[in-house]
UniProtKB/Swiss-Prot annotation:
Annotated coiled-coil segments of the chain: none
Gene3D superfamilies: Kinase associated protein B domain
Tree of life domain: Bacteria
Function: May play a role in the activation or the expression of KinB.
GO annotations of cellular component type: plasma membrane
Protein species of origin: Bacillus subtilis (strain 168)
Subcellular localization(s) per the UniProt record: Cell membrane
Lineage, opening ranks: Bacteria, Bacillati, Bacillota, Bacilli, Bacillales
Chief location bin: membrane
Protein name as annotated: Kinase-associated lipoprotein B
């Protein structure tokens, strides 16, 4: 049974990222959510070995793009009642929050994650 309707503005948890989006379709097991803003940037590295740097493949995870649609299971979608921020500003804030946490951490995993974040920010914000 669906709790939300098409057009509802929600907070969706997708992998390790958190997004504000609009429901564009209700399906039996999930909602199709169109991304409007980023609340939490996805974590970097191997999700099967969290916070470990010495892994065979250290994943670079991008935030979902503005307008990108993704399937999110019903139980991972919550109501969102606030104002929807500008996508680019929300992405800047989410990456800044992640950077601050990683700088505090100081582990090898955090250093590798910061390296990935540097690359992603150049791509996101067209920095040289």
């Amino acid at each position: 049974m669906s709790t939300f309707e098409t057009g509802s503005i929600v907070k969706g948890f997708y992998k390790t990222g958190v997004y504000i989006g609009e429901i564009t379709a209700c399906r039996p097991q999930h909602y199709l959510v169109k991304v409007k803003a980023v609340l939490t940037h996805p974590a970097q590295g191997d999700l099967h070995h969290p916070k470990q740097a010495d892994v065979p493949f250290f994943h670079e995870r991008k935030a979902l793009a503005y307008g990108e649609q993704t399937n999110i299971p019903h139980h991972m979608v919550k109501p969102y009642d606030g104002e929807v921020p500008d996508y680019t500003e929300s992405l800047r804030e989410a990456t800044a929050q992640m950077r601050a946490k990683l700088n505090e951490d100081g582990s090898e995993w955090a250093k590798r994650s910061l390296h990935n974040l540097d690359i992603l920010e150049k791509e996101y914000f067209n920095r040289p």
